[in-house]
């Protein structure tokens, strides 16, 4: 079975899409917010998606890994908070009204903290041929690629529909 984990699942849309479209996946969806997990559970049930839900702090993964997140995963996906606090004034009002601030914003002093924690987790828990898929703030793509390289990952950057560097695909570098 293909083991997949979605960090910062929110409403569960990514985890649900993967659970419904991959062949025999074992999908785990992680979020710190009990309210987000309740919404994700309801959405998964309504859409007949088999998913294990875990309440955990992405930033504490490496200090205390829950049993359901032990072992290796073939795919890690995450759309973590990535908007710097200083960008808040440029946000559309409808986004600010409908999304919790904790799901959107990161401190200007450490905008890549979630990515760093997930990459550190992946060093141990991503299978050798596994892949990490991130959504990222275009302002921080180069820094993310540097962090990935320092931890032994290659990073391919992909554009969104507006031509912005928005997605990063990381793979462990081969040891050859």
Residue ranges and their predicted role:
Residues 1-88:
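Conserved SAM/SAH cofactor-binding pocket of Class I
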Residues 18, 95, 118, 122:
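Class I S-adenosylmethionine-dependent transferase superfamily signal
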Residues 22-24, 48, 99, 127, ...:
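Short, well-ordered coil/turn elements that cap or connect secondary structure elements
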Residues 82-113:
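Mobile active-site "lid"/loop adjacent to the S-adenosyl-L-methionine
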Residues 108-170:
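Conserved Class I SAM-dependent methyltransferase catalytic core
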Residues 173-176:
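Flexible, glycine-/basic-rich loop-and-beta segments that form/coincide
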């Amino acid at each position: 079975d293909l083991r997949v984990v979605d960090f910062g699942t929110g409403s569960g849309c990514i985890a649900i899409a993967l659970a419904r479209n991959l062949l025999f996946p074992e999908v785990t969806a992680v979020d710190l917010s009990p309210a987000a997990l309740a919404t994700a559970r309801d959405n998964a049930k309504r859409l007949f998606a088999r998913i294990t839900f875990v309440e955990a702090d992405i930033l504490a993964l490496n200090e205390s890994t829950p049993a359901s997140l032990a072992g290796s995963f073939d795919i890690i996906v995450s759309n973590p908070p990535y908007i710097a606090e200083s960008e808040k004034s440029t946000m559309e009002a409808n986004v600010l009204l409908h999304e919790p601030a904790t799901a959107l914003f990161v401190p200007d002093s450490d905008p890549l903290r979630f990515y760093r924690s997930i990459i550190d987790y992946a060093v141990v828990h991503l299978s050798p041929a596994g892949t990490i898929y991130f959504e990222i703030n275009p302002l921080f793509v180069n820094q993310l690629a540097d962090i990935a390289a320092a931890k032994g990952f290659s990073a391919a950057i992909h554009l969104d529909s507006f031509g912005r560097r928005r997605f990063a695909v990381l793979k462990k570098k081969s040891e050859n």
